[in-house]
Amino acid sequence: MYGNMNNGGHAPYGYNGYRPSGGRMWGMSHSLPSGMSRYAFSPEDTDFTSSYPGPSMNRRGGYNDFSGGGGGGGGTMGSMNNMVNAASTNSLNCGGGGGRDGHGGGSNGTNLIVNYLPQDMTDRELYALFRTIGPINTCRIMRDYKTGYSFGYAFVDFAAETDSQRAIKSLNGITVRNKRLKVSYARPGGESIKDTNLYVTNLPRTITDDQLDTIFGKYGMIVQKNILRDKLTGKPRGVAFVRFNKREEAQEAISALNNVIPEGASQPLTVRLAEEHGKAKAQHYMSQLGLIGGGGGGGGGGGGGGGGMGGPPPPPMNMGYNNMVHRGRQNKSRFQKMHPYHNAQKFI
């Protein structure tokens, strides 16, 4: 094993190899933190064995070799193509087909985003959960590429749009290890989703997701909805967000439902774009702080108009120079008081 090395065939410095008479496996003999065994890094401790049919796993000190090609870009866990679930023959691809933004390579109708995942949930568990709906192209949990820490959300791309729709209806809102999953369509960024999210108020306090679909579903495809609930009671607060697939659908819903009393409600709905609601809320908050107001007016004999932060600020004072002059005056007066003969003529 070590015959080609210039150390007489012995193990390299820093390692204890297999002994002819039997004994311990090799381990690092360098100094380790107190309380940790020098043989804690034995290859047997990190040797993985496959419990499911799939790619061959070579022993490489804890690293697994996964055969098969991965997709281009966006895979934070690398290419894990051809990992097969024990109860299925469909491949689990945790890195293939990813885009630059990490949203996966599926179309908008098949690619789902899953939020609020348990921190200890694995890709295999996620795959097994969604594979019950239908065949999956890609499935991956987004993690920190250095630490492997889960960010708590994942992307699942189905082979068929009908399966993605059934996954939203069946798995959205289920509880996994005290975490309530949120399953919805993964939306691309940029201008394509602008002006599609609606902010709805004055809804009945007994509103449900199905009733919200009945009210808004006739105007277009709803890709995401969220009914705000009271944190203590869990009951609806009469406020919801509804996101459509196209901005034209959102505008049609605004025109048809704004200031209209739906069935089961006692007051008219207020339906507007969520972006406008956010801007109005921010402007109201700024006005409460007095940061938005009338400009300062000048006038006549120095009569100044008030309001807000009107008028330019005064020019900054040269504080450094003023402090130096003041300090010099202080020292001079103090010196004169301490030495009464300061102004006396010198004696020769």
From Swiss-Prot:
Molecular function (Gene Ontology), one example: mRNA binding
Top-rank lineage group of the source organism: Eukaryota
Keywords of this entry: Nucleus, Repeat, RNA-binding
Gene Ontology CC terms: nucleus; ribonucleoprotein complex
GO biological process terms held by the UniProt record: alternative mRNA splicing, via spliceosome; sex determination
InterPro entries with a match to the protein in the record: Euk_RNA-bind_prot, Hud_Sxl_RNA, Nucleotide-bd_a/b_plait_sf, RBD_domain_sf, RRM_dom, Sxl
Region: Disordered, residue numbers: 296-317
Stretches with biased composition (Gly residues): 296-310
Domain RRM stretches: 110-188, 196-276
Gene3D superfamilies, A to Z: 3.30.70.330
Protein's UniProt keywords contain Repeat: yes
Main location: nucleus
Localisation per UniProt entry: Nucleus
The keyword Iron-sulfur appears for this protein: no
NCBIfam families: sex-lethal
Record function comment: Unknown; apparently not involved in somatic sex determination.
Protein name per UniProt: Sex-lethal homolog
Species of the source: Ceratitis capitata (Mediterranean fruit fly)
